[in-house]
């Protein structure tokens, strides 16, 4: 994937370009923004550029052909460390940072990033799901954050500064990523050949995505799409019955299956939908002007009918 295929993040690209041109690349960055907008893709492209073995005049332009570029693309580069929350875990386990009890400080991110680079001139670690770092995990990173090994780069990826521990935020350069526009989400969905059905079009998915590709893909499941609209209808009644409202959410979570992690993800999704509703409600009652490409016509019409003048 080329940089120009990573939509809507030109300002972040230019920021790193300036930092590299001035030889002022920081050791730790915190990428924040809604899920599903390309933060992880951007981090991997940056890693590919920094670990590219080709000689070229533009340090942020990887050749995509050398062994280094190919290994980053395949997530097998010896100087790239990737950490994320396991699917069935509620947090990133401590072992990911300092190894298990038998190999404390001999394995994990903190050990690996301190080793001499094998191929490239840098060691790069990317922590996805930084929202799920607990205090113990953050504390294990303190020495790496305060005394970064020479030539190391650590990128943490989360949804907001508020969800990060203060020990992380205070030691990181913050890079903010904005949601995609609906037209950009539509373009990506169309390129990925997401299949439309009789009830849900790609336009419906893009409009409902809140600028998040992952949300759009999730909503391609008719059950999720219908739940979203049902939830909005209940919230729009001004006084939704507590029992019925709770049952709607619980039934949606339970239908995900037996895995608690899947149920938890659906509860988080329900909370995100509620936030989306009340954001639009505020826009409606304050009559604020908003870019039409970032408004869900269905939700805007619903809130206008229920709460508009």
Identify the role of each PLM range.
Residues 87, 145, 223:
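A short beta-strand motif that forms part of the nucleic acid-binding face
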Residues 1-49, 57-60, 150-152, 159-273, ...:
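Charged, glycine-rich active-site and insertion segments that engage polyanionic ligands
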Residues 74-76, 148, 168:
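Short, structurally constrained coil/turn elements
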Residues 101, 105, 122, 133-137, ...:
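Short, well-structured alpha-helical patches and their helix-loop capping segments
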Residues 139-153:
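Conserved catalytic/switch belt of AAA+ P-loop NTPases
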Residues 2-136, 302:
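Clamp-loader machinery-focused feature within the broader ASCE/P-loop NTPase space
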Residues 96-97, 142, 169:
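"Short basic amphipathic alpha-helical interaction patches in structured regions
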Residues 120-124, 149-155:
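Loop/turn-to-beta-strand initiation segments
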